[in-house]
Amino acid sequence: GGITYATDVETPQGVVVETGRPIECLRTLLSSGRYTVGHIVCFRDSAYARSVPETALVREDGQLWYDAEGQAWLDPTDPQVLQYITALVKECGELGFKEVLLDQFCYPADTTGVANTAADPAQVLADFAENLRSALPEGTALSVVVRSTDSLSVEQMAELFDRLYVPAEGDLAAVKAALPEGYDPETRVVAMTAEAPQSGSYVIVS
C-alpha cells in the first residue's frame, strides 16, 4: 500500500508515496555498482483496494473481501491493477535495479467467500508474469516470493522466474525438492532470513 520513493507512476489516493526520497537519489544509488533488488508487493494491497474498490476481490454482496489478517486483495484479472503493477515493474527496471522481486504474486491461500476468483488462477498469473518480463530491460532478473503454491506450483514458478525467494515461515526443503531438473537451488533459490545460514543464497530481512 506504499511506495518508498518518489515514483513517476500514477497512484490512486490512499497509496502513500514517500516523496522525501527523490527519484534522482535512487538513481545515484542504483548506479553505484551494487546488486540491487526492487521489491514489489503485488495483489495484497489494502490501500489500493480501499481507494479503488472496483479493482479488488469482493464478496457476493459486492463489498471488499478481507483475508484472516484483515488485508484486502486486488483482482489479478483487473486491467487497471495489471497496468499499475506493470508500470512499477517497468520503472524499477528502467531505474537500474538488477532484479525485480514480486511478493504476494498469488491469489489468497484461502479464497472462501470471494465472489470474483478466476476460473484458472494459474493461467492468469502465468500470463501476467510473462507480460511483466517483456516489460523489463534485457538482463534484468524477475523473481518471486513463494508465499503460496495454491495458485502456481513451485515447478511453474521455476519456469517463469529467475529466482525463488522462500520466506522464513516457508518450507525451504519442500521448495527445493519440487524444483524441475536443471534449476540450480544453490544460486536460484534464496532463503529470506533474519540471520545468515551456513551455505546457499539468502537475503537478510529485518
Label every model-predicted segment.
Residues 175-206:
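C-terminal active-site rim and adjoining tail of enzyme catalytic domains
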Residues 43-90:
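Active-site-adjacent "subsite" loops/lids of carbohydrate-active enzymes
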Residues 1-20:
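Aromatic-lined carbohydrate-binding/catalytic grooves of carbohydrate-active enzymes
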Residues 11-15, 112-123:
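Glycine-rich tight-turn/loop motif centered on a GG-T
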Residues 1, 74-114:
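Active-site groove signature of glycoside hydrolases
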Residues 102, 110, 166-169, 203-205:
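Conserved beta-strand positions
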Residues 25-43, 89:
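Substrate-binding cleft of carbohydrate-active enzyme catalytic domains
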Residues 35-45, 101-103, 121-155, 165-168, ...:
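Aromatic-lined carbohydrate-recognition surfaces of secreted/lumenal glycan-active proteins
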